[in-house]
């Protein structure tokens, strides 16, 4: 199983990217059982002022992503390091519970956020280059999906435990990034 630090290794990172590229360019069709474009609004507790604010921001992010444009391709949608496994020098994806047709930008943004690419600016920039997210328009779309990933998994964590520190941290980071964008 990969460790978060394995994405610092260019060879392992590129094997993971290759696995995602192969998935995204495949002819697979997934049922629409999980969509990051709306799941956050279904799990947010709008009687809680903080979660209500997060939901409203999520709605604005989805509006912006929709305005930019969404492509639907086969996506894994849960790309924390433990879902990448190495067997006989090959990288595989496991845990397909949330797979569905979605935008590849969510997959990559989710991978970056869940594996802390943001903690190393050089790694983040190199990895963005490796996946072809180079111009400002692509970076903007990627960043919106990154915020959406934080909102989705942050709310998900709070549903499991209302005191989940990682969930609160993800949501607070999403809010900070959103307000920095001044939407």
What is each residue range found by the language model?
Residues 1-9, 25, 41-46, 151-165:
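A glycine-centered beta->alpha junction motif in the catalytic cores
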């Amino acid at each position: 199983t990969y460790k978060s630090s394995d994405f610092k290794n260019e060879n392992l990172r590129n094997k993971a990217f290759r696995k995602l590229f192969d998935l995204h360019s495949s002819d697979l069709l997934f049922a629409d059982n999980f969509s990051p474009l709306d799941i956050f609004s279904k799990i947010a507790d709008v009687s809680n002022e903080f979660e209500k604010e997060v939901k409203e921001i999520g709605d604005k992010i989805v509006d912006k992503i929709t305005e930019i444009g969404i492509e639907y391709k086969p996506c894994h949608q849960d790309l924390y390091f433990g879902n990448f496994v190495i067997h006989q020098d090959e990288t595989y994806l496991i845990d397909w519970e949330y797979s569905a047709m979605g935008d590849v930008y969510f997959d990559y943004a989710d991978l970056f956020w869940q594996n802390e690419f943001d903690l190393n600016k050089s790694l983040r920039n190199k990895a963005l280059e490796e996946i072809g997210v180079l111009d400002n328009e692509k970076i903007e779309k990627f960043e919106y999906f990154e915020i959406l990933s934080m909102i989705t998994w942050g709310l998900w964590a709070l549903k499991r435990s209302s005191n989940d520190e990682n969930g609160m941290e993800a949501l607070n980071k999403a809010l900070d990034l959103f307000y920095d964008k001044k939407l």
